[in-house]
């Protein structure tokens, strides 16, 4: 694929609205992975959250990959496109010519020829990874890479927002479950 811009302002608006209008992280990430695959004409997209304890990338949402590929084994942050955690997007134009892929054999069997990994960051800390897969060599334009970085930062904000919202809802439910004479005291 040549180096042409795929992300225009209309696509960026649709994607940004999908992020801003969702209160559910699972629905939002599933919608975004499907939207990106269709709009960019790529093979697949996966969003991962970093488990800080195990250093594994846990799948938030994925579209376009087989169950066999998704279940190939744990995706370790230090072995799978590890340089993305230095804070910059990584473009792998040919998966056969890199040592950054943890499961190269499975990637080839899946029909993956190239991939782009973009850190999902909040306040400079990586929370996860937005990963896009293509079935042919992919030379991503600088403008599209910049757009994907901004998108990933918005996803980071949305992840934090939905976690905060879920925490507040959980606290509200806990307060409402308290005995009748205690709950009103906490609401004032």
Q: Which residues does each predicted region cover?
A:
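Short regulatory alpha-helical segment in sensory/regulatory domains of signaling proteins that mediates
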Residues: 16-20, 32-41, 49, 108, ...
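Signal-transmission linkers at sensory-effector interfaces
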Residues: 1-27, 168-184
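Regulatory sensory and allosteric helical modules in signal-transduction proteins
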Residues: 58-60, 67-102
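Signal-transducing coupling segments at domain and membrane junctions
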Residues: 93-114, 134
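GAF sensory/regulatory domain recognition
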Residues: 34, 46-70
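A short, aliphatic-rich beta-strand micro-motif
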Residues: 113-121
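Short beta-strand-to-loop transition segments that serve as allosteric relay/switch motifs
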Residues: 129-138
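Allosteric cytosolic regulatory segments
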Residues: 149-157
């Amino acid at each position: 694929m040549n180096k042409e811009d795929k992300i225009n302002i209309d696509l960026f608006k649709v994607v940004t609205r999908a992020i801003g209008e969702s209160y559910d992280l699972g629905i939002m990430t599933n919608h975004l992975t499907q939207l990106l695959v269709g709009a960019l004409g790529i093979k697949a997209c996966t969003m991962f959250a970093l488990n800080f304890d195990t250093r594994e990338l846990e799948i938030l949402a994925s579209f376009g990959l087989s169950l066999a590929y998704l279940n190939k084994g744990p995706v370790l942050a230090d072995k799978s496109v590890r340089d993305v955690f230095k804070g910059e997007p990584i473009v792998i134009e040919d998966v056969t010519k890199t040592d950054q892929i943890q499961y190269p054999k499975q990637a080839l069997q899946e029909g993956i020829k190239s991939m782009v990994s973009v850190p999902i960051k909040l306040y400079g800390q990586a929370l996860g990874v937005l990963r896009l897969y293509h079935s042919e060599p992919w030379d991503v334009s600088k403008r599209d890479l910049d757009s994907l970085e901004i998108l990933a930062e918005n996803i980071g904000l949305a992840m934090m927002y939905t976690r905060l919202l879920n925490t507040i809802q959980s606290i509200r439910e806990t307060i409402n479950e308290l005995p009748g004479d205690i709950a009103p005291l906490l609401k004032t």
